């Protein structure tokens, strides 16, 4: 374990888009009052993916969708909103998650099967999908990667980020 830890180094000015071929952006689209609330991470090529999901019987629509998305072992993008969890929203919640997936895929010109979706925030409220889809159109491939970290905050007061390099 000590040898492994000695091979890990912190990158001071790094972010989610530091690895070659990765891009990210975050924007304020109106799900929250003032803060950034929508973002994505995009890879130039499909990347390996794994997931750990809740075993709770009640699972948010994005969780249900992403369980199927990761079965092929690869994703190329993830789109995330904060301010609304899209949880306990029934069939319309799953429809909205699939809409986020499809609109993101079209914006990035990739297959929807390569897009994961995540939502965090208030439970039990329908996701304002028109606001979200309009916001996806505002996201940039070469946007501000630090904005992504801001866009996924819920009640946090600071961004939680670390970038490391291993040998």
Regions picked out by a protein language model, each given a short descriptive name:
Residues 1-54:
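N-terminal amphipathic/basic leader segments beginning at the initiator methionine
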Residues 45, 68, 83-85, 120-122:
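Short, ordered loop/turn segments at secondary-structure junctions
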Residues 41-74:
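Active-site-flanking structural segment that lines cofactor/substrate pockets
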Residues 25-31, 51-54, 66-70, 152-154, ...:
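A generic local secondary-structure boundary/capping motif
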Residues 98-99, 103-167:
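Glycine-rich, mobile lid/loop segments that gate access to catalytic sites or pores
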Residues 41-42, 79-81, 118, 165:
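Short beta-strand segments
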Residues 79-108:
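Alpha-helical support elements that line or immediately flank enzyme active sites
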Residues 72, 87-90, 160-161:
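Short glycine/serine/threonine-rich phosphate/pyrophosphate-binding segments
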């Amino acid at each position: 374990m000590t040898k492994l830890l000695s091979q890990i180094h912190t990158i001071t000015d790094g972010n989610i888009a530091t690895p070659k071929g990765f891009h990210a952006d975050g924007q304020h689209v109106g799900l929250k009052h003032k803060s950034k609330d929508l973002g994505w991470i995009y890879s130039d090529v499909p990347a390996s993916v794994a997931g750990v999901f809740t075993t709770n019987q009640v699972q948010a629509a994005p969780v249900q969708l992403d369980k199927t998305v990761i079965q092929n072992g690869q994703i190329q993008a993830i789109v995330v909103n904060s301010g609304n969890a899209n949880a306990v929203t029934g069939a319309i919640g799953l429809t909205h998650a699939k809409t986020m997936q499809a609109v993101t895929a079209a914006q990035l010109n990739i297959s929807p099967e390569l897009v994961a979706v995540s939502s965090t925030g208030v439970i039990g409220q329908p996701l304002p999908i028109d606001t979200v889809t309009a916001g996806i159109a505002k996201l940039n491939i070469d946007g501000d990667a630090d904005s992504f970290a801001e866009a996924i905050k819920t009640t946090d007061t600071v961004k939680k980020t670390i970038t490391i390099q291993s040998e």
